[in-house]
Amino acid sequence: MERIHELDSLTFSDMLRQGSVSLSKDKNAINDLNVFPIPDGDTGDNMLMTLKAGCATMKDHLGTLSEMAQAASSGMLLGARGNSGVILSRIFAGLAKGLQGLIIADTNAFAKAMDAAVTEAYKAVPVPVEGTIITVLREGAAGADASGDLNHYLETLLEAMQVSLDHTPELLQVLKDAGVVDSGGAGLLSIFRGMNDALNGNITAEEIESTVTLSTPTVELNKFDENSTLEFGYCTEFLLRLMRSKVDVDTFDETEIFDYLNRVGDSVVAFREGTIVKVHVHTFKPGEILNYCQQFGEFLTLKIENMTLQHHQTVNQNNASFKVPPKKYGVVTVASGEGLVNAFHEIGADEVIAGGQTMNPSTQDFIEAFGRINAQHILVFPNNKNIKMAADQAAELYKNADIHVLPSTTIGEGYYGIGSIDRDNPDAEEVIASVTEIMQSVVTGMVSTAIRDAEGDQVSVHTGDYVGYSGKQLLSDSPNRKEAASALVKRLDAASRDVMLVFFGEGVPQDEAEQLVAELTETYKNLEIMLNNGTQPVYDYIFVLC
């Protein structure tokens, strides 16, 4: 086997792609490293989709090691899903920073880049918790030996990561109680195992498919003929590489482009990542925008769609009138299930991103949702702790409105929070403070199917049973779904509340839900109960008490 002393761009690309292959094989086992007996955010899936987004950005990209690392980082930044995916994207952002300006990297240079990855990963977490992915990264980098070739460095890195991963239950009691190691750390170890395989020449032929590439839409050409009128303009998207032959890349102020786009277009989403400017804009004259932007660089990708032609195939918000004054507040939230989505729209949400407990939206999903809202302030309700980091990352990248990510961790908090927004109050901070206070008074309980045995507060949970819980508290368990639901409502102290919303899920017959509500109404005579068909996955019932 050839020993590698210097890392070039092609080898780095192979390493990341093989890391994706390795993680793809291990993702189900990683998903099963779940400390909670309810289907969770699927760490393996989130990390894999994030890594694939980076691999997709690198595809067919020829450049230096530095440029390749930056391309991967940019793709992961936008494709990041779930907390584990966001942290992974920041790890590779740090690695890219450490490799910045390098055509090749020897062992010492790569080791320093790994140290930069550690620093960036810890910055991504407001309150770092040891015993997680960041610990495995830090202790792995600290234990790796950079005195030899890259093969030796990766081998010792993997050894140190494995030791660290095995030790995570000693750092987090919740892992020890569940008898598992940290899932994010396991995912990271799998990625670096694949990277090590590639470095040693063990590259599989498995195709790495992108999870972020958009499919080509079906176009009904008869919807726009020779007698039609262009009502909605063109949806124009492109990636522009700033070129040193045209501008001083290091000092160029991208707001020159952003200000121009806001003058001539609508629904602008534009941001810069390194030397790449990503643009989404609605305009009647895409040619003028392309000509203007080309004076600063060259296009990497380009897509123009006739929105009048797409009128019958796209959502209503893409057809909004141009050049209308922005409203004060816009709202973005996250939910799954047609009934829940409709409920959020009815209560005042402008955009409901498809997602939730086991389907975490990406940073890109949030950015695109922001771009479809014409508002000064956009309030974001993630409704899940595992979604908030992607929302926060999107908020940092988006520059065309003030984005406020609120601390909603449940469907109930998001629902009541959105419904309480005082849209006539000009003071955004007052509005946010009021909404946050109201959300804190909301209690949300869910019923789902247990995927493992567990011990909770006064309840033993058995695999396959229906389990009622609130936050991370296990409150009821029964083989009978209705019994588990009734016991949960009692544990939530429904008798002390005034109103309870009940959303029943996609697998629950309506007559069962109606019977449950009838029984609860008889038991809690002073409680106003409202039943809704949420059609949500994962949760058989969602109870929201206020």
What does each model-identified segment do?
Residues M1-C546:
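N-terminal loops that bind phosphate or other acidic moieties
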